[in-house]
Amino acid sequence: MNILQYTFFQNALLGAFLTSILCGIIGTYIVTRRLVFISGGITHASFGGIGIGVFTGTNPILAAMIFAILSGFGVQWMSSRKDVRKDSAIAMFWTLGMSVGIICCFLTPGFMPDLPSFLFGSILTIEGSDLWLLGILTCITIAVFTFFLHPIQSVAFDSTFARSQHLPVAAIEYLMMTLIAMTIVASLKMVGIVLAISLLTIPQMTANLFTYNYKQMIFASIILGWIDCIIGLYASYVLNVPSGATIIFVSIMVFMLSKTIKALQNKLYNKDKLSLEKK
């Protein structure tokens, strides 16, 4: 394809590949640990950091990452207290980030051309610095999961049991909250704040239809995410529509197709089982 000759499209493919690895690993923990709502709260809270970055003239991604990590820590700390419900803590930081972001953007003079890309994403605008961020974060995440897979997996499935085994549950939860926040912010250029949480959940949901094994879910999520990105990028180029939204739409279609296939498999299996029992 002629489109592959362009540097911006090559960057988009590389960015999609790195993001698929990153979201495949972190997203599996999110889905297994049932942290989708918390991750959604952190995603929207990161807008506060973007607003502060735009207002102060600093790097919006760096500001968003710091704000997202602090928000994640805040949710984790407040939800561990008996006098605050987890969903209430999430809602508070969710709205805090959005309100701070809106106020800062309103107070910033002049036109802000990068703001729509943070809200809705544009993978075709990924630059070298974005690829470096994704690459470094991907390497860090792979290293963390390579050396600490067993305790992370234990906390993901049953934190109470992990605590009874004298594992550092609190430290692991804060470590994972940091990686979740950094992954969300690093993915903003891909699909934006509005759709970022989808990259961390939909491929994992699709993988979970066919396996419950943690490692298999990670690898399947990476492959599915990469396929979704390639198809979405090509479709957005052909149809001349936003790439981020197209990638998410494709991932949802893949999930629905997989769900249908799985349902048909179960139906055929039950039918064959019933016929064998009659014999």
Please identify what each model-predicted range represents.
Residues V194-A245:
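Transmembrane alpha-helical segments in multi-pass inner-membrane proteins
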Residues V241-I248, I252-K279:
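Cytosolic-side transmembrane-helix boundaries in multi-pass membrane proteins
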Residues M1-I21:
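Membrane-interfacial amphipathic/re-entrant helices at transmembrane-helix boundaries
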Residues G15-G24, A45, G49, G53, ...:
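Alpha-helical transmembrane segments in multi-pass membrane proteins
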Residues L13-L18, I61-I66, A91-M92, L131-I136, ...:
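Hydrophobic alpha-helical transmembrane segments
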Residues D130-I202:
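Helix-loop-helix "hairpin" substructures at the membrane interface of multi-pass membrane proteins
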Residues Y6-N11, K82, I90-H150:
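Transmembrane helix-bundle core of multi-pass membrane transporters
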Residues T28-F111, A207-F219, S236-L239, A263-L264:
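Short loop segments and helix-boundary regions at transmembrane helix junctions
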